[in-house]
Amino acid sequence: MKTITTFLAAALVFGASNAAVASDSEAVTVGGVAMENSSSSAAFAAVKKKLGKWEGQMTQSLTGAVFDVSYEWRLTSGGNTITETIVEDGVEMLTTYNDRDGELVVKHYCALGTEPVFKVSEVSDASMSIALDEAKSDLQRAHHNFVTDMKWTMDASDPNAMVFENSVLLDGEVTNNRAELK
């Protein structure tokens, strides 16, 4: 009896937790109220292709250091937001992706203590680039350290591989970083 009870409890918890994750074809309701899915830009769709966990190594141009990295993208908020949990050399950060008025807005919560906001500069089937949205970021190049741009390029020969590149402004100097991910 204990085994059956444990199994049923686990099934209920697992089923309830899976029910909270939205897919493209499911309507999301909270308390019987339908939630609108407002994330439909081409850039949001490009980020959705990355859902899951990607791991690899990053090379930092400033020091030449090579270190382990992981990036995990999850769909949340009824399918309207994607969160990216980043771990670079053991340091965790967070980036959010959501559409506002049909445009992808990216906000990065950085280990540098800054929160740059980005807009899409290019999106295609093979890559997506974002750059600092200076109108929405209260950051000054003379006074702050922050990520200035990011780019993801999918490997055409291997759908389970991509390259991630970013540029970071550190004490007025730009450093470029590159990670190969699987």
What are the functions of these language-model segments?
Residues 38-53:
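N-terminal helix-cap/turn-to-beta initiation motif at the start of protein domains
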Residues 28, 161-182:
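Edge beta-strand at a domain terminus
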Residues 51-57, 164:
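A short, Trp-centered hydrophobic/proline-enriched beta-strand micro-motif
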Residues 124, 156-160:
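Residue-level recognition of beta-strand termini and adjacent short loop/turns
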Residues 19-22, 27:
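Boundary at the C-terminal end of the N-terminal hydrophobic targeting segment
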Residues 32, 37-40, 56-144:
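Central antiparallel beta-sheet cores of small beta-barrel/beta-sandwich binding domains
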Residues 3-19:
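Gram-negative bacterial Sec-dependent N-terminal signal peptides
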